[in-house]
Amino acid sequence: MAVDGSVTLELKNISKYFGSVVANKGVDLTLHKGEILALLGENGSGKTTLMNMISGIYYPDEGQIFVNGREVSIASPQDAFRYKIGMVHQHFKLIDLFTAAQNIVLGIKGRYNIKRINEEVKDIADRYGFAIDPKKKIYDMSVSEKQTVEIIKVLYRGADILILDEPTAVLTPQETEKLFSVMRAMKADGKSIIIITHKLREVMEISDRVAVLRKGEYIGCVNT
């Protein structure tokens, strides 16, 4: 069950077209504070396109987005972060020669105190149970460690709403269980999480509710 009944994110009648292709059509969706919501659908169902509109990669052609009851316009990832929304994509955007901490603050304006940043990254890791060395170079990391850096990156920027796009696709079963443990810790801390997946077993294990998309349209949502 969700920690809090308040709606933190709401989509109303969201549509997106690419020429004659309908990616999403009239989608309604709600996410509550402290909830893990699974977004389920086959490949090409519009899951990632929908989440890309929430995270500022695409802009909806129709519909409204509300964050904490307020209508917002999200035209860029910077806008999304302004509303405390962060998305972790399947393909990581990290610089191999940089450390975890350097990647996490990359793009943030201002001077860096790397010692302080290392400490802040470690604090976030300890808070949610991540296993990561802030000083470790990306080229020395496993795939799961790289994913951890991407998740901490959005948490460092203050995200309260996290979108994870097929996060288990690159993980072993043991790494998946560790990720789910971290997700439960974030949920307990009041974070709201959307996990994009097509794996029903994982939906039943980790989510509070599951919303189903098919051919770009919202089919329904049920408690899990």
Language-model-detected regions and their locations in the chain:
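Glycine-rich phosphate-binding loops of nucleotide-dependent enzymes
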Residues: 2-224
